[in-house]
Amino acid sequence: MRHRYSGRRLNRTSAHRKAMFRNMAVSLIEHEMINTTLPKAKEFRRVAEPLITLAKEDSVANRRLVFSRLRDRKAVTKLFNELGPRYQARPGGYLRILKRGFRAGDNAPMAIVELLERPLPDSQEE
């Protein structure tokens, strides 16, 4: 029986899954929006939300904990200097997952994962 198993395996080894979510988290922090498949997006939420929660309190311990999960100095700096303060008043739910149709090659359901309250690009501010 499969009772109490949490999380999707996504047909990957644990190391591959961990690396994939690490790369997705760094990309999300850098661009504040990523495109991926719907199952990956839903599973990714479980990885990204706790990182932003840790970034709300800027301490050396939290920075080291986040760095141990991301392994990217620029991403950690942006997370603690920009994103943490941005979501200070929000008690969770920092991501929005939007369905965006199906991929042309294999008909996989696609999704956009974006940070809430993200600033619009300069071209759309008019």
Curated annotation (Swiss-Prot):
SUPFAM superfamilies registered for this protein in UniProt: Prokaryotic ribosomal protein L17 (SSF64263)
InterPro entries assigned to the protein according to its UniProt record, in alphabetical order: Ribosomal_bL17, Ribosomal_bL17_CS, Ribosomal_bL17_sf
GO biological process: translation
Keyword terms: Ribonucleoprotein, Ribosomal protein
GO CC aspect terms: cytosolic large ribosomal subunit
GO terms assigned for molecular function: structural constituent of ribosome
Pfam families: Ribosomal_L17
PANTHER family, sorted: LARGE RIBOSOMAL SUBUNIT PROTEIN BL17M (PTHR14413:SF16), RIBOSOMAL PROTEIN L17 (PTHR14413)
Family stated for the protein in its record: Belongs to the bacterial ribosomal protein bL17 family.
Subunit structure: Part of the 50S ribosomal subunit. Contacts protein L32.
Name of the protein in its database record: Large ribosomal subunit protein bL17
Organism: Nitrosococcus oceani (strain ATCC 19707 / BCRC 17464 / JCM 30415 / NCIMB 11848 / C-107)
Gene that encodes it: rplQ
